[in-house]
C-alpha cells in the first residue's frame, strides 16, 4: 500500500498546458493508468485528464467558430482560379519573349565586339603605316634641314620622331621592312645627336656674344629635342649674368653717390628696387616664351635659377648697407642703452630715423618682389595642375613655399627687421620721454603739448612698421607701442593725477602735499621723468584739469589709431600679405591696444572721482545742509513769502553755477558732462539724507516740490545727460510729501501705479510719510503696501 501522508510521485506526468493547438495526444498513457493501484494516484490522474478534456473542448469550440470564415475564404479561392490560370499563361508568354530578346541581344553584342576588334586592328594598322611613313619623312626632312641649317625645322622632325609610339616601331622592325626601318632609325638617332651638339654650340656662342635674338632662337629649340631642363638651365645662366652685370653697375653707382643727393638716405633701398624690377622685367618678358615652348609649370625652374642670383646680389647690397650705415654697431649701442643701468652714452634718436626708414623701405620692396614671384609661379602651376592629382598640387605648393621662405633674400630681410624692431623701440621710447620732459601748456588750450607729441611719435613708429609690409614687424611695434602707452606714459599721467586737486580744508591740504611728495620721490628714484614742482594752487588746479583732458584725449587717440590700423591692414591682407594666422595675430594686437584705451578711460574716471570728492563735495555738502535752516512747516503767509523770496534753492543753484563755471572753461565737453553727472549724483544722495532728517506739513511739502523742480530744471540745462532718473527717488518723496491724506498713497501704489516704477521700498514710503507732522503714525502703520 502507498503512504497516503506523502504526495504521489507520477514520473513523467505533467499537467496539461493551456491553449496548445489541436491534434496532440494526452500526456498520460493508458499503460500508466493501468499500472496505478492507489486511489489517491487515480484521483490525481483523473483530475489531470479532466483538465485536458476541458482544453480540448475549448480548442474545438474555437475551431467551430472559425468555420464560417474558412468557408468564405474557400469560396473566394475557387473564384480566383480562372484568373490565376490567365496570369500563368501571360507569365509564360512574357518569359518566352524575354528569353528571345536576351538571345538576340547576346548575338548582336557579340557581333559588335567583333566589329570593335576589327576596327581597333584597322586603326593599329593605319597607325603603324603612318608611323612608318612619318619615320621615313622625318629621316628625309631632318637631313635636308640640317644641310640648309634650318635648325628649327630639323628640331621639329626630331620632335616628331621622338613622339612616335616606340612599341609600333619595334613591331615594324620585326616585319619584312625591318632592315630599312633600322637604317632610318640609325640615321635619325645620329641626326638627333648632331643637332643637339649644334644647338648647344650655337647657344653658347650667342650667349657669349650677347646676341639676344639668337639666344632666344636656340632656347626655343631645346624643348623640341627633349632638353627642357638643360634649356632652362642654360638660358637662366645667361639671364643671371645679365642680372649680375646690371646689379654690380648699380651698386658702384650707389657707392659713388654724394651724401647731399636727394635720394642719398635711401640709396640702398633704391638699389634693391632696381634689382627686383630688373628680374621682374625678365620674368614678364620671357614668361610667354617659356609657357609656349616649354609648357606650363616650367616657369618655376627659370625663377628658381634667377632667385639664386638675386640672393647673391642682395647679399652684396645688404653687406654694403650694414657697413656704410654702421647698422650692427648702431644696434649694439641701442641694446646697451636699453639696459636700465647702462652707462653708455645715449644715441640721439634723430640719428636712427633715416636708417629705420630705409630698412622698412628695403623690406617693403622685398615683400612686393616676393609677392610678384608667388603670383607668377602660382598662376603657372594652376594651368599645369588643372588635371593633376591633389598630391601633385601639394608638392608644387611646398616647392613654392620653400623657394619664397627659405631664400637668402627672405632670411636676410628677417634679420634686418629683427634688429630694426629693437632700434625702433629705442627710438620710440627716447622720443616719448623727451616729449614728456619738454611738456608745455599754453593758456587757452585744453591739453598740453606732450599728448600730441607722444601720439605723433607712436603713429610714426607704427606707420613705419606698417610700411615695411611685414605683419610680424607691425604686430611687434603695436605691442611695443601698447606697452609704452600702458606703462610709462600712463604712469606719468597717473602720477600727476595722484598729486590730487588742491584742497580747501587743512586736512585735505595736508593729505595732498603728502601724496605729492611721495610720488615725486618715487619718480625721481626711478629716473624715468623729471617732476616739476607746483608753484601755486592755481597752477596745481590747472595741472590737474589739463591732465584730465590729456587722459581723455589719449583714450580717444588710441581708439582712432586702432580704427586706422584696421583700415590700413585690411588693404594689406587684401593684397595677399599674411594669412589666417597673421590675421589672428594682428587682431590680438588690436585687442590689446583697445584694452589700453579702456585703461585710460578708467584712469579718467578715477581722476573725476577724485575731483568730485576733493573740489565739489566739500562745497556742496554745506550748501545742502543749509536746507535745515529753512523751515518746511509753514503757513500760507510764509509759503507766499517763500515764492517771492526763495530761501534756499536759488542760492544753492547760484552756488553750483559758480562752482562749475571754473571747470566748464578748463575741461573738455565730454569730461565736463561726466563731472556734472557725478555732481548730480552727489546732490541727490546728500539732499535725500537732509530731507529724511527734516519735517514737513502740507504747504512745506509743496514748497519742497517747487524747490526740487527748480533744481532739476537747472541741472537739465547744464548737461547732456538724462538726470531725471537720478532724481527719481527725490521726486517720489516730493509726491508723498504733497499728499492731502495718508490713504491717498494707495492711489499711486501697487496696481494703481500705472507706468510709474517706485524706487522707494514700502518701509521708505512709511518713513517719508512720517516726515509729515500732520499725519498720524497710527494711519501710517495701518497702510498695506
Swiss-Prot record:
Region (Disordered): 1-24
Keyword list, A-Z: Acetylation, Cytoplasm, Golgi apparatus, Membrane, Phosphoprotein, Protein transport, Transport
N-acetylalanine: residues carrying this PTM: 2
Residue ranges of the region described as E domain: 741-785
A Pfam family this chain is assigned to: COG4_N
Keyword Transmembrane recorded: no
Highest rank taxon of the organism: Eukaryota
GO CC annotation: cytosol; Golgi membrane; Golgi transport complex
Keyword Protein transport: yes
Membrane topology term: Peripheral membrane protein
Phosphoserine, modified sites: 6
Subcellular location(s) of the protein: Cytoplasm, Cytosol; Golgi apparatus membrane
InterPro entries: COG4 (IPR048682), COG4_C (IPR048684), COG4_M (IPR013167), COG4_N (IPR048680)
BP-aspect Gene Ontology terms: Golgi organization; protein transport; retrograde vesicle-mediated transport, Golgi to endoplasmic reticulum
Annotated region described as D domain, given as residue ranges: 618-740
UniProt region (Interaction with SCFD1), positions on chain: 2-84
Region (Interaction with STX5): 85-153
Main location: cytoplasm
Family: Belongs to the COG4 family.
Stated role: Required for normal Golgi function. Plays a role in SNARE-pin assembly and Golgi-to-ER retrograde transport via its interaction with SCFD1.
Quaternary organization: Monomer. Component of the conserved oligomeric Golgi (COG) complex which is composed of eight different subunits and is required for normal Golgi morphology and localization. Mediates interaction of SCFD1 with the COG complex. Interacts with STX5.
UniProt protein name: Conserved oligomeric Golgi complex subunit 4
Amino acid at each position: 500500500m502507498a503512504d497516503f501522508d506523502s504526495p504521489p510521485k507520477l514520473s513523467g506526468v505533467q499537467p496539461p498546458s493551456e491553449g496548445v493547438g489541436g491534434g496532440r495526444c494526452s500526456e498520460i498513457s493508458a499503460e500508466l493508468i493501468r499500472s496505478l493501484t492507489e486511489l489517491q494516484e487515480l484521483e490525481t490522474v483523473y483530475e489531470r485528464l479532466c483538465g485536458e478534456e476541458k482544453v480540448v473542448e475549448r480548442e474545438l469550440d474555437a475551431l467551430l467558430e472559425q468555420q464560417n470564415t474558412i468557408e468564405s475564404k474557400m469560396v473566394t479561392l475557387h473564384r480566383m482560379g480562372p484568373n490565376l490560370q490567365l496570369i500563368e499563361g501571360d507569365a509564360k508568354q512574357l518569359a518566352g519573349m524575354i528569353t528571345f530578346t536576351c538571345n538576340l541581344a547576346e548575338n548582336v553584342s557579340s557581333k559588335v565586339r567583333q566589329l570593335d576588334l576589327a576596327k581597333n586592328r584597322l586603326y593599329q594598322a593605319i597607325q603603324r603605316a603612318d608611323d612608318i611613313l612619318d619615320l621615313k619623312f622625318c629621316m628625309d626632312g631632318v637631313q635636308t634641314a640640317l644641310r640648309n641649317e634650318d635648325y628649327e625645322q630639323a628640331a621639329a622632325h626630331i620632335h616628331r620622331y621622338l613622339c612616335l609610339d616606340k612599341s609600333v616601331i619595334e613591331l615594324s622592325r620585326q616585319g619584312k621592312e625591318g632592315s630599312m626601318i633600322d637604317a632610318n632609325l640609325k640615321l635619325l638617332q645620329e641626326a638627333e645627336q648632331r643637332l643637339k651638339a649644334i644647338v648647344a654650340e650655337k647657344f653658347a656662342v650667342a650667349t657669349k656674344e650677347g646676341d639676344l635674338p639668337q639666344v632666344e632662337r636656340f632656347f626655343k629649340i631645346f624643348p623640341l629635342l627633349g632638353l627642357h631642363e638643360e634649356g632652362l638651365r642654360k638660358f637662366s645662366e645667361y639671364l643671371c649674368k645679365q642680372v649680375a652685370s646690371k646689379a654690380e653697375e648699380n651698386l658702384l653707382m650707389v657707392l659713388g653717390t654724394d651724401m647731399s643727393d636727394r635720394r642719398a638716405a635711401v640709396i640702398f633701398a633704391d638699389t634693391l628696387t632696381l634689382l627686383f624690377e630688373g628680374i621682374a622685367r625678365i620674368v614678364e618678358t620671357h614668361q610667354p616664351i617659356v609657357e609656349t615652348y616649354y609648357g606650363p609649370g616650367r616657369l618655376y625652374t627659370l625663377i628658381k635659377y634667377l632667385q639664386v642670383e638675386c640672393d647673391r646680389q642682395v647679399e652684396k647690397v645688404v653687406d654694403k648697407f650694414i657697413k656704410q650705415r654702421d647698422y650692427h654697431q648702431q644696434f649694439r649701442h641701442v641694446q646697451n642703452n636699453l639696459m636700465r643701468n647702462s652707462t653708455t652714452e645715449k644715441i640721439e634718436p634723430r640719428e636712427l630715423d633715416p636708417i629705420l626708414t630705409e630698412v622698412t623701405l628695403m623690406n617693403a620692396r622685398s615683400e612686393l618682389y616676393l609677392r610678384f614671384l608667388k603670383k607668377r609661379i602660382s598662376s603657372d602651376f594652376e594651368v599645369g595642375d588643372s588635371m593633376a592629382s591633389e598630391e601633385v598640387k601639394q608638392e608644387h605648393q611646398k616647392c613654392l613655399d620653400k623657394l619664397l621662405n627659405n631664400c637668402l633674400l627672405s632670411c636676410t630681410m628677417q634679420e634686418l627687421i629683427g634688429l630694426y624692431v629693437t632700434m625702433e623701440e629705442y627710438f620710440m621710447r627716447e622720443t616719448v620721454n623727451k616729449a614728456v620732459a619738454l611738456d608745455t601748456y599754453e593758456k587757452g588750450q585744453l591739453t598740453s603739448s606732450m599728448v600730441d607729441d607722444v601720439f605723433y611719435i607712436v603713429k610714426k613708429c607704427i606707420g613705419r612698421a606698417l610700411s615695411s609690409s611685414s605683419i610680424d614687424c607691425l604686430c611687434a611695434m603695436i605691442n611695443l607701442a601698447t606697452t609704452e602707452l600702458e606703462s610709462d606714459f600712463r604712469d606719468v599721467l597717473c602720477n600727476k593725477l595722484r598729486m590730487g586737486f588742491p584742497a580747501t580744508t587743512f586736512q585735505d591740504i595736508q593729505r595732498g602735499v603728502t601724496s605729492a611728495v611721495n610720488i615725486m620721490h618715487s619718480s625721481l628714484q626711478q629716473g624715468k621723468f623729471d617732476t616739476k614742482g607746483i608753484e601755486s594752487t592755481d597752477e596745481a588746479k590747472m595741472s590737474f584739469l589739463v591732465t584730465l583732458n590729456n587722459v581723455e584725449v589719449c583714450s580717444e587717440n588710441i581708439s582712432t589709431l586702432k580704427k586706422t590700423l584696421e583700415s590700413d591692414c585690411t588693404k594689406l591682407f587684401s593684397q595677399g600679405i599674411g594669412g589666417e594666422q597673421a590675421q589672428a595675430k594682428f587682431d590680438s594686437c588690436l585687442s590689446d591696444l583697445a584694452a589700453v584705451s579702456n585703461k585710460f578711460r578708467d584712469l579718467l574716471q578715477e581722476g573725476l572721482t577724485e575731483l568730485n570728492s576733493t573740489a565739489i563735495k566739500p562745497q556742496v555738502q554745506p550748501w545742502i545742509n543749509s536746507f535745515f535752516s529753512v523751515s518746511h512747516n509753514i503757513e500760507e503767509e510764509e509759503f507766499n513769502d517763500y515764492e517771492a523770496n526763495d530761501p534756499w534753492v536759488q542760492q544753492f543753484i547760484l552756488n553750483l553755477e559758480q562752482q562749475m563755471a571754473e571747470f566748464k572753461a578748463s575741461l573738455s565737453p565730454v569730461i565736463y558732462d561726466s563731472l556734472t553727472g557725478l555732481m548730480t549724483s552727489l546732490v541727490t544722495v546728500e539732499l535725500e539724507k537732509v530731507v529724511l532728517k527734516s519735517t514737513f506739513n502740507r504747504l512745506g511739502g509743496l514748497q519742497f516740490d517747487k524747490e526740487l523742480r527748480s533744481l532739476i530744471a537747472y541741472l537739465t540745462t547744464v548737461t547732456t545727460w538724462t538726470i531725471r532718473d537720478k532724481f527719481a527717488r527725490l521726486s517720489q518723496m516730493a509726491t508723498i510729501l504733497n499728499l492731502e491724506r495718508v490713504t491717498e498713497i494707495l492711489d499711486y501704489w501697487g496696481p494703481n501705479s500705472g507706468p510709474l516704477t517706485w524706487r522707494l521700498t514700502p518701509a521708505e514710503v512709511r518713513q517719508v510719510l512720517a516726515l509729515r507732522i500732520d499725519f498720524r503714525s497710527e494711519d501710517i502703520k495701518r497702510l498695506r503696501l
